[in-house]
């Protein structure tokens, strides 16, 4: 950086020069730009080919902005699906439209608690439609501060606070995410790839099991579909999907810093509070002529045995109804 010679006033009173010149180096800028563009294109194409080679394909990212776009599609008389991944994957919008005469709006989310969305719809004075709520007790009765509750709360918060820039960004992302496989945010980021390194956990570490990578696609209506490889009998991906749920739903041991009886009492109190809050939300919806249908979707084998043991029907489902 080359500065001009200080003026007489600056020499007397001090202070740096107020102007400077920065000469541009005489290098082949056009050629350098072409090289950079070629490197970026080559790297992008190579990464895309690699992602497709390991099984990935183009799909929309399930984020708060996409959820918000569907939430905005809810009309006063809409049929709305809320809850967890069972209501997300197990319900086909085309078939429901044929049977119900109206196309539902899909607001269920993987690993999410349906209560924040239920409460938000209850507060919407204009809504008097029908809610189909998927219930997995461990998720639906999750206390505040847990990941299932936070997923629902973040989505509802984004609906009420989404900026025009965030909304425009989601619309601009559609054509790219529908064509490019490596834009899978939740699985192909550097942070996620580092977590996949086969490094053994230290002794006594309580690390949650990792979900299988890329087994479903998502469209602009948030319809979730499993990829074809999931249907191949005996495939590694199918086995991983089948075997992940028991360790994922197995509760961790109670904390050692509090007596077990006291801990269980707090859990019971939290569930009781959730029953009370659900009752208030349902009464608001009923008072406007709306309907709500609670559904437990089919599950079997070891997962059903685990859920029946940890969240028995008599303590969760029956009181809910």
What residues fall within each predicted segment?
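Second-shell loop/turn segments in exported
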Residues: 81, 106-108, 264-271, 281, ...
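Hydrophobic membrane-insertion alpha-helices, especially the h-region
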Residues: 28-52
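Alpha-helical transmembrane signal-anchor/signal-peptide segments
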Residues: 52-75
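Secreted/periplasmic serine-hydrolase-like ester/acetyl group-modifying domain
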Residues: 150-288
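Membrane-embedded segments
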Residues: 82, 86-175
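Substrate-gating cap/lid alpha-helix
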Residues: 299-321
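Loop/turn elements at helix/coil->beta-strand transitions in domains of secreted/extracellular proteins
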Residues: 76-78, 101-103, 127-130, 286-293
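N-terminal Lys/Arg-rich, disordered targeting/topogenic segments
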Residues: 1-30
């Amino acid at each position: 950086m080359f500065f001009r010679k200080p003026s007489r006033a600056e020499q007397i009173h001090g202070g740096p020069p107020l102007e400077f010149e920065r000469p541009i180096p005489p290098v082949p800028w056009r050629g350098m730009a072409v090289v950079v563009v070629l490197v970026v294109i080559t790297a992008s194409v190579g990464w895309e080919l690699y992602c497709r080679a390991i099984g990935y394909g183009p799909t929309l990212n399930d984020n708060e902005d996409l959820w918000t776009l569907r939430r905005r599609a809810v009309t006063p008389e809409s049929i709305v699906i809320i809850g967890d991944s069972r209501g997300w994957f197990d319900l086909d919008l085309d078939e429901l439209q044929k049977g119900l005469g109206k196309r539902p709006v899909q607001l269920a989310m993987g690993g999410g608690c349906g209560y924040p969305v239920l409460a938000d719809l209850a507060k919407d004075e204009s809504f008097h439609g029908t809610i189909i709520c998927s219930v997995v007790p461990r998720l639906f009765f999750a206390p505040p501060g847990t990941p299932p509750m936070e997923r629902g709360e973040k989505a509802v918060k984004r609906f009420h606070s989404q900026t025009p820039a965030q909304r425009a960004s989601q619309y601009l992302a559609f054509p790219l995410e529908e064509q490019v496989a490596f834009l899978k945010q939740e699985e192909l980021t550097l942070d996620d790839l580092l977590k996949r390194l086969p490094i053994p956990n230290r002794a006594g570490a309580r690390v949650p099991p990792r979900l299988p990578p890329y087994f479903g696609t998502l469209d602009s209506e948030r319809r979730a579909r499993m990829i074809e490889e999931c249907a191949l009998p005996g495939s590694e991906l199918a086995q991983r999907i089948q075997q992940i749920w028991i360790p994922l739903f197995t509760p961790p041991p109670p904390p050692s810093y509090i007596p077990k009886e006291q801990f269980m009492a707090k859990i019971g109190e939290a569930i009781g509070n959730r029953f009370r809050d659900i009752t208030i939300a349902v009464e608001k919806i009923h008072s406007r002529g709306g309907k709500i249908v609670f559904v437990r979707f089919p599950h079997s084998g070891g997962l059903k045995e685990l859920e029946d043991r940890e969240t028995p029907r008599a303590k969760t489902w029956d009181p809910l109804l």
